[in-house]
């Protein structure tokens, strides 16, 4: 929820309290997602779990909207984190199953594009009409959307999530596959900064006197420019090679954070948002391909889970908690400066790993 930090600040919570509430979501999600996976796989109830999770998010958001007490919000935040954890994974599996049944599996990119368009419309509308005077309404809106999603999920076909995640075996990879371990260190450092920007961008824009519509446009730009770039990944890799595409995409992040630290005109933030799309294309497509070719097939699901944990679980959780404390004591500029340092370190680590241990020759054939 891109506006949650802004809402929590508006009701008077301290930076530390905000950091705790924000950090819980990726951390809990990381911890419970394997449990959801086991429940779904063993009982073959992926669709039922998706429906239940959507309705669970609905309940948690109704609770969130009904109180400003920190302890109660902590409870509803944990509930929300637990319930939202399986939605992305199972939703993707169901979508792919539907497309495969209709001989349209290559159309998955189009579905993702519609998701980005929906997100762009939502964040622009919230930014333009709710942020300035009625930000509380993000919770009822989010709740209703998840309730509707649960109803829609009742009608979609069943699907199996293929690729067993062996967590014990996966963790042992960090000791056996040193290349993967080094790579994940860099990804972890990058993940710290991404968790912060996903939650504090709205706070930052308000701090530099940005209007609600500017916040909405900034978030919409990030979403709308992401998918077209992802669709061009095979072309980029064929022309420049996977190493350059991966490292160059990640390298824009320290530049982005540094620019944030020194910009005080909210309109100048808008063109910088394109850098987000470049980086996410690298991290959500190219880096995944790189990790996939480091491992034998039976360990790829576990390797990808470790990658996701570093980028979207442990990294963001630590970053969000630290950002709350730093923001309270020193303001948002120092947050961005430290993000620049972390992202630069992460970029250097990733660059060293991918150039020291280049992709296997067969990888290029697979990508092409």
Residue ranges and their predicted role:
Residues 31-45, 130-131, 228-241, 327:
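Helix-to-loop junctions at the C-terminal end of transmembrane segments
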Residues 155-187:
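Juxtamembrane intracellular "pre-TM" segments in multi-pass secondary transporters
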Residues 60, 70-87, 188, 268-282:
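Hydrophobic core of transmembrane alpha-helices in multi-pass small-molecule transporters
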Residues 1-26, 179-218:
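Helix-loop boundary and gating motifs at the non-cytosolic
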Residues 126, 138-161, 349-354:
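C-terminal membrane-cytosol helix-exit motif in multi-pass small-molecule transporters
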Residues 48-62, 143, 244-259:
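Structural signature of the two symmetry-related core transmembrane helices
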Residues 128-144, 325-343:
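A membrane-interface helix-boundary motif in multi-pass transporters
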Residues 78-114:
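Cytoplasmic helix-loop-helix junction between adjacent transmembrane helices
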């Amino acid at each position: 929820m891109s506006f949650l930090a802004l809402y929590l600040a508006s009701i008077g919570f301290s930076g530390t309290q905000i950091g705790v509430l924000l950090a819980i979501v990726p951390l809990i999600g990381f911890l419970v997602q394997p449990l959801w996976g086991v429940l779904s796989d063993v009982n073959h109830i992926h669709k039922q779990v998706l429906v239940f999770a959507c309705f669970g998010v609905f309940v948690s958001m109704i609770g969130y909207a009904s109180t400003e007490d920190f302890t109660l919000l902590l409870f509803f935040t944990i509930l929300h984190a637990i319930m939202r954890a399986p939605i992305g994974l199972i939703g993707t599996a169901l979508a792919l199953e539907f497309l495969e049944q209709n001989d349209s599996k290559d159309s998955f990119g189009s579905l993702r594009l519609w998701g980005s368009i929906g997100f762009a419309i939502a964040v622009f509308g919230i930014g333009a009409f709710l942020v300035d005077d009625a930000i509380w309404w993000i919770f009822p809106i989010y709740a209703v959307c998840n309730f509707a999603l649960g109803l829609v999920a009742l009608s979609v076909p069943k699907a199996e999530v293929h690729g067993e995640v062996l967590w014990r075996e996966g963790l042992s990879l960090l000791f056996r596959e040193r290349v993967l371990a080094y790579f994940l260190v860099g990804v972890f450092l990058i993940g710290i900064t991404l968790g912060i920007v996903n939650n504090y961008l709205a706070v930052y824009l308000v701090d530099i006197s940005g209007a609600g519509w500017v916040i909405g446009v900034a978030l919409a730009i990030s979403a709308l420019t992401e998918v077209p770039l992802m669709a061009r990944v095979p072309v980029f890799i064929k022309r420049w090679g996977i190493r350059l595409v991966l490292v160059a995409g990640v390298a824009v992040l320290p530049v982005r954070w540094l620019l944030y630290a020194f910009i005080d005109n909210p309109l100048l933030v808008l063109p910088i948002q394109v850098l987000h799309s470049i980086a996410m294309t690298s991290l959500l497509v190219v880096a995944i391909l790189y990790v996939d070719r480091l491992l034998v097939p039976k360990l790829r699901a576990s390797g990808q889970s470790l990658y996701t944990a570093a980028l979207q679980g442990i990294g963001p959780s630590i970053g969000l908690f630290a950002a709350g404390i730093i923001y309270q004591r020193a303001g948002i500029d120092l947050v961005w400066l430290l993000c620049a340092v972390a992202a630069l370190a992460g970029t250097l680590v990733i660059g060293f790993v991918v150039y020291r241990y280049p992709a296997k020759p067969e990888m290029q054939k697979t990508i092409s």
